[in-house]
Amino acid sequence: MVDQATLDKLEAGFKKLQEASDCKSLLKKHLTKDVFDSIKNKKTGMGATLLDVIQSGVENLDSGVGIYAPDAESYRTFGPLFDPIIDDYHGGFKLTDKHPPKEWGDINTLVDLDPGGQFIISTRVRCGRSLQGYPFNPCLTAEQYKEMEEKVSSTLSSMEDELKGTYYPLTGMSKATQQQLIDDHFLFKEGDRFLQTANACRYWPTGRGIFHNDAKTFLVWVNEEDHLRIISMQKGGDLKTVYKRLVTAVDNIESKLPFSHDDRFGFLTFCPTNLGTTMRASVHIQLPKLAKDRKVLEDIASKFNLQVRGTRGEHTESEGGVYDISNKRRLGLTEYQAVREMQDGILEMIKMEKAAA
């Protein structure tokens, strides 16, 4: 059973959400009294409670979603809350739906999105992975962080050819290395307030680190928001090359480290928005005519299931007219379909930009 102190915090949090009339999060929308009462006393095998799930959304009433999964089991234990939120966010994922098996597809059908180099500054494809047998951030101990870092860094040190590189632990990092990684926009900072309040930043910087290849086109973040964020990126719009590099890397890592996978939700992640393929294919792009009004840009993008963010990602503004545009759907479709959705949408948006007066 859940202890009284936690229950009191849960009741107070529920009341706060109910009274926050300007809160538009999916948490507030779907955490009804019935749902709340049905799961407030539950606990996972690793000790996670509903408070671990909702505390970030209770603290940050401006959250879009407002919940995180403290461990893999939470998706089932707190299903009455996760299920409707996942269905809502991913544009329809019913209780009977299942995420399809991994399918990278025919890489040769992908193209360079902007061969003339007029619009796209860079292209990036990333996916998140969790290591089997470990909980997610809020439930990890300092020892587990170290153990995971050891497993991952030794796996990455065996990367070959284009993927060969160096692992830089955040613990004890020299100022010079730190500055270089900041200049390259590679260094992740301790989490923002959404992650902080989800308890995703405990024992920082223990167990956290960054691996990148010599060409700086392949990158792995270790124990940031997810256990692993595997990233392929480069300047320009050559999506085919970027995607192919990611596929090679993920398959390579997966052959050595078992990932946390669920028959219904696909690959499991800390945030329910990333479930399934966990894949986010994005471009940094300038579309000055379409972007005269960000709202218009967002409306156009959403027609293609694309999402617009500021230059430096979520919760940021555009700098110099550069936007980050990516696929929104990650669940209920294959990796190939997700990357195709981004490709086809961006090609259409470039066409519209060229045609605009």
UniProtKB/Swiss-Prot annotation:
<dbReference type="GO" id="GO:0005524">
    <property type="term" value="F:ATP binding"/>
</dbReference>
<feature type="binding site">
    <location>
        <begin position="64"/>
        <end position="68"/>
    </location>
    <ligand>
        <name>substrate</name>
    </ligand>
</feature>
<feature type="binding site">
    <location>
        <position position="225"/>
    </location>
    <ligand>
        <name>substrate</name>
    </ligand>
</feature>
<dbReference type="Pfam" id="PF00217">
    <property type="entry name" value="ATP-gua_Ptrans"/>
</dbReference>
<feature type="binding site">
    <location>
        <begin position="280"/>
        <end position="284"/>
    </location>
    <ligand>
        <name>ATP</name>
    </ligand>
</feature>
<feature type="binding site">
    <location>
        <begin position="309"/>
        <end position="314"/>
    </location>
    <ligand>
        <name>ATP</name>
    </ligand>
</feature>
<feature type="domain" description="Phosphagen kinase N-terminal">
    <location>
        <begin position="9"/>
        <end position="91"/>
    </location>
</feature>
<dbReference type="InterPro" id="IPR036802">
    <property type="entry name" value="ATP-guanido_PTrfase_N_sf"/>
</dbReference>
<dbReference type="GO" id="GO:0046314">
    <property type="term" value="P:phosphocreatine biosynthetic process"/>
</dbReference>
<feature type="binding site">
    <location>
        <position position="314"/>
    </location>
    <ligand>
        <name>substrate</name>
    </ligand>
</feature>
<dbReference type="InterPro" id="IPR022413">
    <property type="entry name" value="ATP-guanido_PTrfase_N"/>
</dbReference>
<dbReference type="InterPro" id="IPR014746">
    <property type="entry name" value="Gln_synth/guanido_kin_cat_dom"/>
</dbReference>
<keyword id="KW-0067">ATP-binding</keyword>
<comment type="similarity">
    <text>Belongs to the ATP:guanido phosphotransferase family.</text>
</comment>
<protein>
    <recommendedName>
        <fullName>Arginine kinase</fullName>
        <ecNumber>2.7.3.3</ecNumber>
    </recommendedName>
</protein>
<dbReference type="GO" id="GO:0005737">
    <property type="term" value="C:cytoplasm"/>
</dbReference>
<feature type="binding site">
    <location>
        <position position="185"/>
    </location>
    <ligand>
        <name>ATP</name>
    </ligand>
</feature>
<dbReference type="GO" id="GO:0004111">
    <property type="term" value="F:creatine kinase activity"/>
</dbReference>
<dbReference type="Pfam" id="PF02807">
    <property type="entry name" value="ATP-gua_PtransN"/>
</dbReference>
<dbReference type="InterPro" id="IPR022414">
    <property type="entry name" value="ATP-guanido_PTrfase_cat"/>
</dbReference>
<dbReference type="GO" id="GO:0004054">
    <property type="term" value="F:arginine kinase activity"/>
</dbReference>
<dbReference type="GO" id="GO:0016310">
    <property type="term" value="P:phosphorylation"/>
</dbReference>
<keyword id="KW-0808">Transferase</keyword>
<comment type="function">
    <text>Catalyzes the reversible transfer of the terminal phosphoryl group of ATP to L-arginine.</text>
</comment>
<feature type="binding site">
    <location>
        <begin position="122"/>
        <end position="126"/>
    </location>
    <ligand>
        <name>ATP</name>
    </ligand>
</feature>
<dbReference type="InterPro" id="IPR000749">
    <property type="entry name" value="ATP-guanido_PTrfase"/>
</dbReference>
<keyword id="KW-0963">Cytoplasm</keyword>
<comment type="subunit">
    <text>Monomer.</text>
</comment>
<feature type="binding site">
    <location>
        <position position="229"/>
    </location>
    <ligand>
        <name>ATP</name>
    </ligand>
</feature>
<dbReference type="GO" id="GO:0005615">
    <property type="term" value="C:extracellular space"/>
</dbReference>
<keyword id="KW-0547">Nucleotide-binding</keyword>
<dbReference type="InterPro" id="IPR022415">
    <property type="entry name" value="ATP-guanido_PTrfase_AS"/>
</dbReference>
<keyword id="KW-0418">Kinase</keyword>
<feature type="domain" description="Phosphagen kinase C-terminal">
    <location>
        <begin position="119"/>
        <end position="356"/>
    </location>
</feature>
<feature type="binding site">
    <location>
        <position position="271"/>
    </location>
    <ligand>
        <name>substrate</name>
    </ligand>
</feature>
